[in-house]
Amino acid sequence: MELFPVAVNGVSHAEDPFSGPLTFIAPWNYKVLATLMFVVTAASLSENFAVMLVTFRFTQLRKPLNYIIVNLSLADFLVSLTGGTISFLTNYHGYFFLGKWACVLEGFAVTYFGIVALWSLAVLAFERFFVICRPLGNIRLRGKHAALGLLFVWTFSFIWTIPPVLGWSSYTVSKIGTTCEPNWYSGNFHDHTFIIAFFITCFILPLGVIVVCYCKLIKKLRKVSNTHGRLGNARKPERQVTRMVVVMIVAFMVAWTPYAAFSIVVTAHPSIHLDPRLAAAPAFFSKTAAVYNPVIYVFMNKQFRKCLVQLLRCRDVTIIEGNINQTSERQGMTNESHTGEMSTIASRIPKDGSIPEKTQEHPGERRSLAHIPIPENKVCPM
């Protein structure tokens, strides 16, 4: 099977897409795309580099539950470094000037790192479910468990992104001619089987994990809130986490649903005529996830923000770490910290995962969940 047939992605290329721009697309369209990719890539690289740098500098952030957060930032950083940078350059030139094999490598790298980031979100959801709901009783999330999660993410993603390089489907130039992607437009049944399998394992399955884990987590929080009082403050952790979960799921859907829907529609109807500029939109949406993932999953964590601010002020890291150690208990008890709220709830759930019966207490003795000392897991971005 030829990697690049005469007709590439449904566009008849008497003009080689690797030798010059498509003549029926005005040059200014490519300049607009280049500008957008420059903004997205610059923002993503700076944000995700900040996440990795701060985690490296502050030992308080190097906790098992944060391993997958850093992994997400690494994957997003690599997506932007490879796909974002190359997309900016190729759109600036108006065509994929790097050649056929560079197209294969770029298509593989962007798809691989993108799926690593996507599955990192699913593993993060599972780990939060594991910590809060305690499905295995008193077994805690430790470094070896987090490391196994990372190994799964990178291995599973590689298994489902290497086949096009080896002949099961292919990586080819996109319809607009400036990026490379899996060959959605192939009419070959052999290629269709890969697209369907890829759609199930790299979109439906992780989305299912995310939805199920967060729904069970919210259900557990609701039970805890109902058990420990009817005061507004007792409901606050549940409301905060519910809002955060909604944001996470919506962000996931915004980033990946257009790309998944596009791949299925084009696979089902290979001869469909789409404007190349419209066909480029789903891939652009998926790349923007690298910008808002750090905001949702990292920058909204109070302790991380404090470390980042201190680092930007160029203060001595040793002094900063000492200050954080001295105030960690107070941070855990603050109402503003998602970390404290999640750890508080986890500490109130019995080791067997059951919900204790309500006990009679005097009005003056009733306390909010947010004011209970936190014994562990103080760094738990939520």
UniProtKB/Swiss-Prot annotation:
Location relative to the cell: Membrane
Entry-annotated residues carrying N6-(retinylidene)lysine: 287
Keywords carried by this UniProt record: Chromophore, Disulfide bond, G-protein coupled receptor, Membrane, Photoreceptor protein, Receptor, Retinal protein, Sensory transduction, Transducer, Transmembrane, Transmembrane helix
Bridged cysteine pairs (disulfide): 103-180
Principal cellular location given in the protein's record: membrane
Protein's membrane topology: Multi-pass membrane protein
Transmembrane helix in keyword set: yes
PROSITE patterns in the record: G_PROTEIN_RECEP_F1_1, G_PROTEIN_RECEP_F1_2, OPSIN
Tissue-specificity statement: Expressed in a subset of retinal horizontal cells as well as in retinal ganglion cells.
InterPro entries: GPCR_opsins, GPCR_Rhodpsn, GPCR_Rhodpsn_7TM, Opsin_pineal, Retinal_BS
Membrane topology (Extracellular): 1-35, 89-103, 169-193, 266-279
Cytoplasmic side: 57-67, 125-147, 215-244, 301-382
UniProt region (Disordered), positions on chain: 330-371
Name of the featured protein: Opsin-VA
Record GO terms (molecular function): G protein-coupled receptor activity; photoreceptor activity
GO BP, one annotated term: phototransduction
Signal peptide, first to last residue: none
Lineage: superkingdom: Eukaryota
A GO cellular component entry from the record: membrane
Biased composition (Basic and acidic residues): 349-368
Organism field: Rutilus rutilus (Roach)
Residue spans crossing the bilayer: 36-56, 68-88, 104-124, 148-168, 194-214, 245-265, 280-300
Family assignment from sequence similarity: Belongs to the G-protein coupled receptor 1 family. Opsin subfamily.
Biased composition (Polar residues): 330-346
